[in-house]
């Protein structure tokens, strides 16, 4: 026997492959307050036991690899390894299980969503032993939450900046989303803001294209904001999309927005990436800019029920990375969103402390301590007839974003904005008087339409418009 072989034997090293569950499945483990906890929906390949599948997820997303390695002896696996500590079947689904995994906090860089996701939702999602894998929820411990700055300003500071209280905020995405010149784009913004909206918005794919370069758009939109403010006496804003091909260009656009004196910029946080988003969030905090977040690409990640990552995880990640608004489903309208599940992650965005509630898809109690909240944004196929339901379901701390529901008004953009503002004010007034928006909503809108020809015209145009499809995102 060679000296080298003797050395291997003397330290207990045994080459080869062993089952993951022998090391990473630990049902006796008691979770710590400092652990990051994850709930994975696991669909094992035929013949793979759920314990082995859950342990494989824990291993491949923390310290494990496919074979025993020498260097395991140079560190403390008990201190650093992820542990699958509980597995339960998914009711009503064949061969699907929820695997709960605990990760020691020292596995993750402080203040880095990028690093957290690189481990937890990294290569493990391509693992051959699994047919499918979905991250349903994360519990972020207080010790890790406190390493993030979170939203640049938060809900209360935004209301103070805008001097708008006691109602949802109103917005509009300018359409057509692509093809307008900067001057015509600015004109549409002005008409909507003058009509009564609080915000107008760049569409997520408006960056700096040949038909409208970013600097021209910023200038004309700033002119629209100042003109509308002078005429209405209200503070107005336009979400100027600072998303760019590199971080330096993104920050340059945000700097120009600040120099123009506008209140808010925008970022596509999934296509732009978490590192870029956190950098922009820090700039916005330091320079008094609000930050609107669009979730373009989210459905690629979260739409499939058995693979990918649920949006509640992306919402938590955004709150940590930083953003003052984020699009988060409507329940009504044309885009995906089941009511209880949507309200679950809306609470995760807005509230300080959220209790575990499996009926709403919340797998863990989450304490955000002092981190500011994020305003959820409702958009996609909504119009004046949806106003009572939106006001009732989401309350005051939300942004209601009507694109086609403003610009599609038969009389033009400003009357479309007037119709939405009148409908909102009528719903808030009725709610404050104790009326039931769920049962009396249509009547409230009809009463308001008697005094607003703009609202009456909008009601007539969209009276038959419905988007009736079953939600894909169910428990």
From Swiss-Prot:
Its main location: plastid. One of its GO terms (molecular function) is ribulose-bisphosphate carboxylase activity. The lineage of its organism: Eukaryota, Viridiplantae, Streptophyta, Embryophyta, Tracheophyta. Its EC number is 4.1.1.39. Belongs to the RuBisCO large chain family. Type I subfamily. The keyword Amino-acid biosynthesis does not apply. The modification N-acetylproline is found at residue 3. InterPro entries: RuBisCO, RuBisCo_large_chain_AS, RuBisCO_lsu_C, RuBisCO_lsu_C_sf, RuBisCO_lsu_fd_N, RuBisCO_lsu_N_sf, RuBisCO_lsuI. The basic functional RuBisCO is composed of a large chain homodimer in a 'head-to-tail' conformation. In form I RuBisCO this homodimer is arranged in a barrel-like tetramer with the small subunits forming a tetrameric 'cap' on each end of the 'barrel'. Heterohexadecamer of 8 large chains and 8 small chains; disulfide-linked. The disulfide link is formed within the large subunit homodimers. It is found in: Plastid, Chloroplast. This is Ribulose bisphosphate carboxylase large chain. The gene is rbcL. Substrate binds at residues 123, 173, 177, 295, 327, 379. Residues 1-2 form a propeptide. The disulfide bond which can form in the large chain dimeric partners within the hexadecamer appears to be associated with oxidative stress and protein turnover. It holds the Pfam family RuBisCO_large_N.
